[in-house]
């Protein structure tokens, strides 16, 4: 049968007990964002016999080999059906591999990187890989179009100018300030340390001013979600300018 839904596969197996050996073929690496994970969990519940898994080639290793780039030092993200931060990750790593997919994900990825001043990164895009319709493009992001990232595709980003700074603390003079009040450096450091943030934390900065606290929190973890709330129009503008300056999405 041609089927990808876990429950349908399990139902078929239950209904056909006459089969002593069953093979299930999935594309890609079974340990790399694969449907094999959920399927194995369900099969373990209904099958008493041993389950054997044989991995294929992941989209990451396939794309990397096609463009001649090693990937052992790449940061890996999946934006397929997920709303995740990725600008800061690309800003802080020499290589980032991303899986794109879903409505407008590719366009959002393309436009967001340009918005944050990352148009100079080298990008490799692979769509329909290993099929007859395979399309692989390489070049600077600013040379490409949003349409190049449409559909289910994999992207390998090389950023030779990535941020190598080990410390997360920012000095007051690094922020764009204007006449809007700003929480001073020492207070920011102590306050954020006391929060004991986790990597998946959600933070609300009410009365964010220039966004100094919001930005320092965002820099503390690439997937921390920060909501900066400010009613002063000048402050709102400064928050937007500072988040782009420090590439905290």
Question: Over which residues does each language-model region extend?
Answer:
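Class I S-adenosyl-L-methionine
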Residues: 1-52, 223-226, 230, 241, ...
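A contiguous loop/helix-start segment that scaffolds small-molecule binding in enzyme catalytic cores
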Residues: 3-7, 21-22, 95-180
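Gly/Ser/Thr-rich loops at beta-strand to alpha-helix junctions
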Residues: 27-34, 55-59, 101-105, 210, ...
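Class I SAM-dependent methyltransferase SAM-binding "motif I" and its flanking Rossmann-like core
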Residues: 28-94
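Conserved alpha-helix/loop element of class I SAM-dependent methyltransferases that forms part
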Residues: 184-199
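Conserved class I S-adenosyl-L-methionine
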Residues: 200-209
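Conserved SAM-binding loop of SAM-dependent methyltransferases across substrates and taxa
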Residues: 210-222
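Short alpha-helix immediately C-terminal to the canonical SAM-binding loop
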Residues: 236-237
């Amino acid at each position: 049968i041609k089927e990808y839904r876990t429950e349908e596969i399990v139902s078929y197996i239950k209904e056909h007990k006459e089969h002593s050996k069953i093979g299930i073929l999935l594309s890609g690496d079974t340990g790399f964002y694969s449907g094999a994970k959920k399927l194995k969990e369900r099969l373990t519940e209904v099958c008493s016999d041993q389950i054997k898994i044989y991995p294929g080639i992941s989209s990451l290793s396939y794309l990397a080999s096609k463009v001649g780039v090693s990937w052992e030092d790449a940061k890996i993200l999946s934006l397929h059906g997920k709303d995740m931060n990725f600008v800061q990750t690309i800003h802080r790593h020499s290589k980032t591999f991303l899986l794109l997919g879903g409505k407008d994900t590719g366009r959002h990825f393309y436009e967001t990187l340009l918005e944050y001043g990352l148009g100079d990164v080298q990008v490799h895009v692979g769509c329909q890989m290993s099929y007859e319709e395979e399309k692989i493009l390489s070049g600077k992001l600013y040379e490409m179009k949003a349409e190049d990232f449409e559909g289910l595709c994999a992207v390998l980003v090389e950023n030779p100018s990535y941020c190598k700074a080990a410390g997360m603390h920012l000095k007051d003079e690094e922020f764009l300030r204007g006449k809007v009040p700003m929480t001073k450096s020492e207070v920011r450091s102590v306050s954020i340390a006391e929060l004991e943030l986790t990597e998946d934390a959600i933070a609300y900065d009410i009365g964010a001013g220039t966004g100094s606290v919001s930005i320092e929190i965002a820099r503390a973890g690439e997937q921390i979600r920060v909501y900066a709330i400010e009613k002063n129009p000048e402050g709102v503008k400064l928050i937007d300018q500072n988040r782009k300056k420090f590439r905290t999405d």
